[in-house]
Amino acid sequence: MRLDSQLLARELAAFEAQHTRRRRQLAEAFPEPGDPTAVRVGGQVLRNFCSNDYLGLSHHPELIRAATECMSRFGFGAGSAHLVSGHSHEHHALEEELAAFTGRERALLFSSGYMANLGVIGALTDRHDQVLADRANHASLLDAARLSGARLRRYAHGDMAHAEQMLLAQRAGGETGESHKSNGAGTATTLIVTDGVFSMDGDVAPVSALTALAQRHHCALMVDDAHGLGVIGASGRGTLELTGAASQAVPILVGTLGKAFGTFGAFVAGDAALIDYLIQRARTYIYTTALPPAVAAASRAGLRLAREEHWRRERLHTLTLRFRAAAAALAVPLGASTTPIQPLIVGDSAWALALSEALMNAGFWVAAIRPPTVPAGTARLRITLSAAHRDQDVDALADTLGKLWREKSAA
């Protein structure tokens, strides 16, 4: 336990010396109505290139109207957990619409993606089980596996051969998979978990290969598609649609409402038995207040717009290609991502911070991502695009990056 103030001060000083101390920037206002990409920070209006508002829906008037009208009927707070008195018509309708959108029997709302992952993995695994995870997975998947008590094994990022080696080694070690599980879920399992789109690199998981791997080794597969749903796939149904993976081959699908859909919260989609079981066993669902009904109402509006307005995804894809082409022409070495997440890996944390500050001085908000969020030596700018960005802002960002990168290379 670290409650000694001097010890805490020394650790904070160490973070400072390593250029890894985290600080918050204060967003003061959004000065252009309906435009989520212009934000005032420190008295300066910046173009935001580090949010996850991929479709530009967070300020959409239909979301604001839906939330406002709902508040006139339900008030603001839910007042209770879903299983007491907090489950409103808006929550229930949103769950049904999310289930239909993802092609599942049912969906279950959680207060955040972090809580969804903790709730699902904690409910389905225990110390008798194994969680096999991509090394680049989101921190919530890693924490969920650790807290569940299951044996956590991590394969090299995107490396299906390594993942299979781990499963074969488990079998060769004589682990039969039989147990008497305290959570009542039956025999021991291996749960394979992966991001759909990896949040720091922007690459897409090899979901089709993972489904084949899971079937060969009789494992369950869980995909957290927080950065894929609403963004990729012909109709916005995410990584599974893009990769052609069958929904029945991925029995556990996690999604978020706080990115493409422009609101807040998360959900798990699956068959009726899975959702009913999570209602009984997922502690992060049972023991917390439900999302405000107004958030659910706004989420329904965001989901409808994401489903119907295909031009938003098309616009986002066009801007992504535009930015990558401009960066390539200026010799800015972006990572190999085809999604709106465009990483520029610079390696050194101090340089990442300096580059972020230089961009802010030029009118762009791009956060520096440093260890331990990313591996040592891979500090980066995590540039994210939105359908709400203007062509001229994307071009100006690329031009500014090109200038800064040339200065770095010449130093």
Language model features: what each stretch is:
Residues 65, 69-112:
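Conserved N-terminal alpha-helix of the aminotransferase class I/II PLP-enzyme fold
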Residues 153, 157-223, 386:
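Active-site phosphate-binding strand-loop segment of PLP-dependent enzymes
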Residues 218, 238-257, 276-280:
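Conserved active-site segment immediately N-terminal to the catalytic lysine
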Residues 314-321, 328-363, 373, 377-378, ...:
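Conserved PLP-binding catalytic core of the aspartate aminotransferase-like
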Residues 65, 69, 73, 100, ...:
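PLP-dependent enzyme catalytic core of the Aspartate aminotransferase-like
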Residues 120-139:
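Conserved PLP-anchoring active-site segment centered on the Schiff-base-forming lysine
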Residues 9-76, 219:
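N-terminal "arm"/small-domain region of PLP-dependent enzymes with the aminotransferase-like
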Residues 254, 260-327, 332-335:
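PLP-dependent aminotransferase class I/II
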